[in-house]
């Protein structure tokens, strides 16, 4: 399934439900928001997005608590959840989706290349994906391996993973 098809599914389901989404991205640097915006009519569902590539911006823009960043770092489950919660609040969206991880070519602070966290915050709770184990309110949605490839490939796969999680969550 291509990212474009999945993005169309996400946007269509949000419009049909009268809901909106906002993104907070680190390793993908806005690629998720751009992919969603490629869908005609996306402005009815896409509120906006934050690119928080620098760790300090996760706190100042996305409202990730400083304690979370100090204790867990920028590449962590807790950070992804806080980013999703923060962007949902900052942008006034029904859904917040975040991406943080390591695109390479080198590991970062003990985290391997291809480690990606997708956070999601919605009307019914928060969830997170790490190495593909997705859950929302305790329901496991799917699984996958660490992402592999060069920086560009990992970033594209991260976007595809975030879109796939949104499709699964939106499908109920």
Regions found by a protein language model. Name each.
Residues 1-172:
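Short alpha-helical segments enriched in small residues
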């Amino acid at each position: 399934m291509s990212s474009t098809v999945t993005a169309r599914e996400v946007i269509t389901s949000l419009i049909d439900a009268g809901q909106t989404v906002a993104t907070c991205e680190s390793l993908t640097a806005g690629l998720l928001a751009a992919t969603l915006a490629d869908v005609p009519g996306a402005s009815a569902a896409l509120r906006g997005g934050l690119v928080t590539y620098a760790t300090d911006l996760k706190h100042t823009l996305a409202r990730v608590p400083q304690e979370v960043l100090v204790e867990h770092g920028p590449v962590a489950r807790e950070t992804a959840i806080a980013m999703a919660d923060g962007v949902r609040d900052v942008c006034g969206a029904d859904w917040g989706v975040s991406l943080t991880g390591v695109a390479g070519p080198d590991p970062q602070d003990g985290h391997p290349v291809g480690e990606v966290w997708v956070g999601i915050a919605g009307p019914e709770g928060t969830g997170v994906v790490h190495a593909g184990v997705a859950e929302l309110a305790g329901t496991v949605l799917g699984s996958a391996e660490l992402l592999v490839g060069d920086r560009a490939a990992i970033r594209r796969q991260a976007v595809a993973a975030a879109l796939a999680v949104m499709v699964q969550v939106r499908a109920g």
